[in-house]
Amino acid sequence: MSVTLHTNVGDIKVEVFCDATPRAAENFLGHCAAGTYNDVKWHRNIKSFMIQTGDPTGTGKGGQSIWGKPFADEIRSSLKFDRRGIVACANAGPDTNKSQFFITYAKQPHLDGKYTIIGKVIDGAEDGGTLDAMEAIPVDAKNRPTSEIRMTGVTVHANPIAIKAAGK
């Protein structure tokens, strides 16, 4: 299962871990399919660490899960922040996942066991790819990009949640 996040900087294709973290995957795919992420800013960008999005208000303080309330973490010991391009739920502490997510720019082992991993980048994390372009964008004192980065749309390549709902 994969989605392509289209941005004004380039595309990022993500493999979603539907079996390993089913609730987080359902929430992420639900937002992708509903257009929640369309025209949303990437509001936090920290070189060598990560870039964050998924807040429809663009402030980093908004967003909601598809169920209208935060959902529990799905921490899996088999999933680690062991490479560039790990996609995970952003949160404000344990069991506070909503619509926001982040993508790592490098290994971040200190995050292991603290954030639910949704998937990994399978296209766009290579040298000279979209993540490089995003990481190179200057930021202000609050790590907000000085040149706007926006999600222009999302392509869901095969949505098992929709297939299940359709009874197929």
From Swiss-Prot:
Pfam families: Pro_isomerase
Domain PPIase cyclophilin-type residues, every copy: 1-156
CDD domains given in the database record: Cyclophilin_PPIL3_like
GO molecular function, one term: peptidyl-prolyl cis-trans isomerase activity
Annotated catalysed reactions: [protein]-peptidylproline (omega=180) = [protein]-peptidylproline (omega=0)
Gene Ontology process terms (BP): protein folding
UniProt xrefs under SUPFAM superfamilies: Cyclophilin-like
E.C. number: 5.2.1.8
InterPro entries assigned: Cyclophilin-like_dom_sf, Cyclophilin-type_PPIase, Cyclophilin-type_PPIase_dom, Cyclophilin_A-like
Keywords in alphabetical order: Isomerase, Rotamase
GO cellular component: catalytic step 2 spliceosome
Family: Belongs to the cyclophilin-type PPIase family. PPIL3 subfamily.
Known function: PPIases accelerate the folding of proteins. It catalyzes the cis-trans isomerization of proline imidic peptide bonds in oligopeptides.
PANTHER family: PEPTIDYL-PROLYL CIS-TRANS ISOMERASE-LIKE 3, PEPTIDYL-PROLYL CIS-TRANS ISOMERASE-RELATED
Protein name: Peptidyl-prolyl cis-trans isomerase-like 3
Organism name: Mycosarcoma maydis
Highest classification ranks of the organism: Eukaryota, Fungi, Dikarya, Basidiomycota, Ustilaginomycotina
Protein encoded by which gene: CYP10
